[in-house]
C-alpha cells in the first residue's frame, strides 16, 4: 500500500461540505477530516469561495472561520511571482473555464511540490501539475 501523502491542498468543495450538513459530500468531508493525518493546506481564495457558497448560513460561515482559526488548515498565499503562472493557467483552461481559486490551488501545488489535492471539482481530473502530471485527488 502506498504511503499516504503528508500534505495536500484543499479546494473549496470539501470545506463547503464539511460545514453544510445538507451537502451531498458532508459525511465524506467529516470522515476525511477525522481520518486525515496529512497537513491540510489551503488559501484565502478557497476560503472566500467557500464563504460565498455558505452565505445563507451564518453558523456554517462562523464554524468554517473558527475551524481555520483553530488550525484546521494551514493557509498559504500566492506570492507575486505566482500571478504570472495563475494567469497562464486561467488562459490555458479558459474553455472550462478555470476560476481564480482553482488557478491559485494549481499554482501553489506547483510551487510547493504538491501533487495531491482534496476537491469535488471534476476539473482537477483535467488540470495538470506543471502541465504534465495528473493531480491525485484524495477526496473523491
Where in this protein do the model-derived segments appear?
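Metal-dependent nucleic-acid phosphoesterase active-site entry motif
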Residues: 1-23
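PIN-domain endoribonuclease scaffold, especially VapC-family toxins
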Residues: 2-8, 27-97, 107, 111-115, ...
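Conserved glycosyltransferase catalytic-site signature
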Residues: 12, 44, 102-103
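Generic structural "secondary-structure junction" signal
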Residues: 17-21, 48, 100-102, 126
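Conserved residues at the C-terminal ends of beta-strands
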Residues: 120
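Ca2+-coordinating acidic residues in Ca2+-binding motifs
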Residues: 123
Amino acid at each position: 500500500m502506498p504511503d499516504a501523502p503528508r500534505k495536500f491542498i484543499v479546494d473549496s468543495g470539501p470545506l463547503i461540505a464539511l460545514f453544510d450538513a445538507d451537502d451531498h459530500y458532508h459525511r465524506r468531508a467529516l470522515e476525511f477530516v477525522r481520518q486525515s493525518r496529512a497537513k491540510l493546506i489551503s488559501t484565502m481564495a478557497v476560503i472566500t469561495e467557500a464563504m460565498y457558497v455558505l452565505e445563507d448560513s451564518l453558523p456554517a460561515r462562523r464554524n468554517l472561520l473558527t475551524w481555520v482559526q483553530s488550525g484546521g488548515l494551514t493557509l498559504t498565499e500566492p506570492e507575486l511571482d505566482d500571478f504570472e503562472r495563475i494567469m497562464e493557467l486561467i488562459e490555458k483552461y479558459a474553455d472550462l473555464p478555470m476560476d481564480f481559486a482553482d488557478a491559485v490551488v494549481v499554482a501553489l501545488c506547483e510551487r510547493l511540490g504538491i501533487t495531491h489535492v482534496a476537491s469535488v471539482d471534476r476539473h482537477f481530473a483535467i488540470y495538470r501539475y506543471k502541465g504534465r502530471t495528473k493531480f491525485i485527488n484524495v477526496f473523491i
